[in-house]
């Protein structure tokens, strides 16, 4: 974020960090690196980066698997959890595929609050997937 204006601390990092302690998550090396960087971005209040990394982790975690195995899929998630991941993908796409100004990308306090809220929502969206991966770990 080019602005020096800092927004709120993201609360979702606490739950995600507790899941990552002791490497309990069944993440491959690619997803694990992205996961760690997402947590660092969230702590640094890099909200757009947090959203982009969260959505990317979902894609990688669902498709990264041992040779000969199938990816995890989303069948075990509830409809609201899948809807949250759909929102996350759409929000990430709005950030990385420029088609005009999107909410939260300005320098005003309102924009900082908007992107911070979306970053928090992004973290909350990936928690159910990470909790499932903890069970597989």
What role is predicted for each listed range?
Residues 60-88, 98:
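Short non-catalytic regulatory patches outside canonical folded cores
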Residues 25-29, 52, 82, 86-89:
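Alpha-helix N-cap/helix-start motif at coil-to-helix transitions, marked by capping-box chemistry
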Residues 19-21, 74, 108:
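A short, mixed-charge helix-start or loop-turn motif at secondary-structure junctions
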Residues 39, 43-66:
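Short, hydrophobic, well-ordered secondary-structure elements
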Residues 1-46:
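Charged alpha-helical initiation segments
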Residues 80-137:
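Charge-enriched, short contiguous segments at helix-coil
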Residues 33, 49-52, 90, 121:
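Generic recognition of short, well-ordered alpha-helical interface segments
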Residues 56, 70, 102-104:
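Single-residue recognition of alpha-helix boundary sites
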């Amino acid at each position: 974020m080019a602005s020096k204006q800092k927004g709120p601390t993201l609360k979702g990092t606490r739950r995600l960090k507790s899941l990552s302690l002791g490497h309990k998550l069944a993440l491959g090396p690619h997803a694990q690196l992205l996961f760690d960087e997402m947590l660092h971005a969230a702590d640094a209040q890099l909200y757009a980066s947090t959203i982009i990394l969260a959505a990317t982790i979902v894609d990688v975690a669902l498709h990264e698997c041992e040779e000969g195995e199938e990816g995890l899929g989303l069948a075990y998630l509830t409809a609201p959890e899948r809807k949250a991941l759909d929102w996350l993908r759409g929000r990430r796409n709005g950030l990385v595929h420029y088609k005009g100004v999107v909410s939260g990308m300005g320098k005003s306090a309102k924009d900082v609050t908007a992107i911070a809220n979306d970053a928090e929502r992004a973290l909350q969206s990936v928690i159910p997937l990470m909790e499932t991966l903890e069970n597989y770990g």
